[in-house]
Structures are given as structure tokens and as C-alpha cells.
Amino acid sequence: MSQPDTPLYPPIAPSGGQLHLRAGADGPPLVAVTLGGGLREGPGLEGYAEGELPSGGRGQVLAPWPNRLRDGHYAWAGVEHQLPLSEPATSTAIHGLVRWAEWQVTAGPEGTEGRGAVLEHVLAPQPGYPFRLLLVAAYTALADGFTTTLSATNLAAVPAPFGAGQHPYLSAGTALVDDAELTVAAGTVLTTDDRGLPTGEQSVHGYDGRVGDARLDDTYGALARGSDGRATVVLRGPERTVTLWADEAWRWLQVFTGDTLAPDRRRRGLAVEPLSCPPDALASGRDLVVLEPGETWTGQWGVTVA
């Protein structure tokens, strides 16, 4: 039987379809991908190649919960739910259910002079999370960075528990994060056990200084905010300063120096993850969003480079 000249399913890169964005001819490139609806490349980011899978959560959307859920178990509306243990070493379910899903492009760069794109994914009900959500990720390239808008709409007929995050790795141009200066303006940090699960909370004055050999995998709360409601994390190198900002929908920030990553990625970039809720929120209920039928949650964050 003869084969068609044009394949029914043309080959696609492991990272999915590529959406190349740029704010004008001289703007820095921003690349969103259909695998997980995340970011592969962008100003101020330590990204990954088109032919790679995103390791360490790199650039991925984390929903309907971020970070770890203890034993993958939680109760909602009087019903016990069990999710697959996606991180067996810690007996936790980590970073949600949409990281490896194929997202659909609903608005491409051709309609925005190359500046923006919108991807969406319908999360279907499944064992452990029997709710239906419409997730939308919108990316806009700027002359000095980019903006991300993430939203979730409850398509089910019952209230749905929800949390979100995103997992960019920042780079200030240093070979290792050790040589960068870091400022996190926060009033508390969670204490955790050896599984990375919360055991308590303590007051801090954030973090301000050279990263050096510090091993960070910390969840910061009580975030200081400017008059615009934004919290910021600043990473400074000799050649550039990278600022990640997050609006009030993001109540927590996870900062991770990447010490557990593969050697070629270890401490090359600093993960700064905007989180709507802390780890284990599906079980604890802390800062968990309750989406009523038809209700939409929206959070915005972005990066500027100077």
C-alpha cells in the first residue's frame, strides 16, 4: 500500500509546537511550546533546547496544584481522593496534571504582530481529580522581558479545589547561580521535612545577598508588595539584572537552586516559582482556591531584564 506524500501527522519536536514571539525586530526572543503550555526560552530565563524535554519542571505550568501533595491524598466535600504518586521517592504527587499534556494554540503570533500567543487545555475529570477545568496560558513579549497570564475556569457543575504555579528558571548571565546576588522580599519561610513537605513556618527577612553555596528549596510567604500589588524577586549578575514580578493572585514564591538536577543543569539557573498556594494545599486547604461552577481564577506574572 502506497504511503501519502504528506504524513498525516508531521514530525514534531519533543518539546511540542514552537511559538516564536518577539516585541519588534530588535526585541528578545520568547518561545512558548504546546507541550505543557509552558515557556522554553525567554529573556532572563535559563531555558532548554527544542529537541529536549523540560527537565526539573523548566518553564512548565503547574495545575491544578503546585509543588508536593503528601502521599497524593486529600479530602474534598467529604470524599477521599487519591492521586498517582508522580514523585515516588518522596511518596508525593507533584506539580499537577498538565505538565505533559498537549495544549492547543487558540491565538498565534501572527495576530499580534509577533508579540503574543494564547494556549489552552481542558483538564478532564480523572481518578483523584474528578473536576473539569479550562486552563489558559497567554504570553506577551516585551522589549525588556515578557508577561504571562494564567487562568482557570471551572467547567464542572460542582465547586473545584484549585491551585497553580509556574516553574521558570532565571539566569543573570553567570555560569552558576553561586555568583549571582539574590533579593527575595518576604516575611516568612516554610520549614519542611526530608520529603519537602511543610512542618511549620518561621519569620525571616527574606533573602538578600550572594547566593554562594547556599542550597535553597524554600517556600516564601508574607511577600512584600509594591503599590502596584506586585511581589518581586531580583537576581543580579555582572552584566544584567533579572526581576521576576508576581501579582496578588500569587501568594507564595518557591526559590530553588537546582541542587538535585542532573549535573549539566545543576545550579545553572535559579527556579523562582510563583505559587497561588503552598505545598500540600489540597490537603491542608491553606490558600486553596475554591472555583465555583463557571468561575475563573486569573494570575499574572512576568520578567524584566535590565
Residue spans of the language-model regions?
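Short alpha-helix capping/helix-loop boundary micro-motifs
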Residues: P66-R68, L282-R286
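A short, structured loop/turn motif at beta-sheet edges
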Residues: A75-V79, T106-A117, T140-G145, T174-D178, ...
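Beta-strand-rich N-terminal accessory domains
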Residues: M1-L83, E87, G229-A249, E295-V305
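Active-site/ligand-binding surface loops and adjacent short beta/alpha elements
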Residues: G56, P159-P161, P168-A249
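Extended, loop-rich substrate-binding clefts of extracytoplasmic carbohydrate-active enzymes
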Residues: P84-A143
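Acidic, contiguous internal or C-terminal segments within carbohydrate-active enzymes
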Residues: P10-P14, H121-G173
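Beta-strand-rich interaction surfaces with strong enrichment in secreted/lumenal proteins
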Residues: V136-A138, R286-L291
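Acidic/His-leaning functional-site neighborhoods
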Residues: G17, T92-T106, D213-S284
